């Protein structure tokens, strides 16, 4: 059997379906990066909790591949990738990557303060709710 080019075909099929992560991986060199005082699993699950609170649309997640791929929301299909690197048993680096500067700043600007314990998940949800009430995005 000859499997040359399968990865390219698979990536093309994912791109056609609208769920490619290649652009997110390609943009990692310009990612917004920060290290947090959590083990990998805790950091990953807390990030998932924040993304769900933000009502981000999660289209791919893989704890094994250390990544989460989202759209900013169901209405805003700008792709954003969150990549996790286990530094040691108690520290994990998070990279927020996107072709859009606004999208990566928006997502990191909401995820990082919760991971930093500067605001609680409940406070973030209240801020998001308040913005929706006033019509601000």
Question: Language-model segments: which ranges?
Answer:
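Ser/Thr-rich, low-complexity intrinsically disordered terminal regions
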Residues: 7-137
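C-terminal motif of bacterial Sec signal peptides marking the signal peptidase cleavage site
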Residues: 2-5
């Amino acid at each position: 059997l000859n499997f040359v080019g399968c990865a390219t075909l698979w990536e093309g099929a994912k791109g056609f379906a609208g769920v490619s992560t290649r652009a997110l991986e390609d943009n990692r060199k310009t990612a917004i990066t920060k290290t947090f005082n959590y083990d990998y699993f805790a950091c990953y699950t807390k990030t998932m909790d924040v993304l769900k609170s933000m009502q981000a649309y999660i289209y791919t997640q893989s704890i094994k591949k250390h990544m989460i791929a989202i759209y900013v929301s169901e209405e805003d299909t700008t792709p954003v990738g969150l990549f996790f690197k286990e530094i040691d048993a108690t520290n994990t680096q998070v990279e927020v990557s996107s072709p859009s500067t606004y999208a990566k700043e928006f997502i990191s600007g909401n995820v990082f303060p919760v991971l930093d314990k500067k605001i609680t998940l409940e406070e973030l949800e209240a801020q998001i709710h308040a913005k929706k009430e006033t019509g601000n995005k």
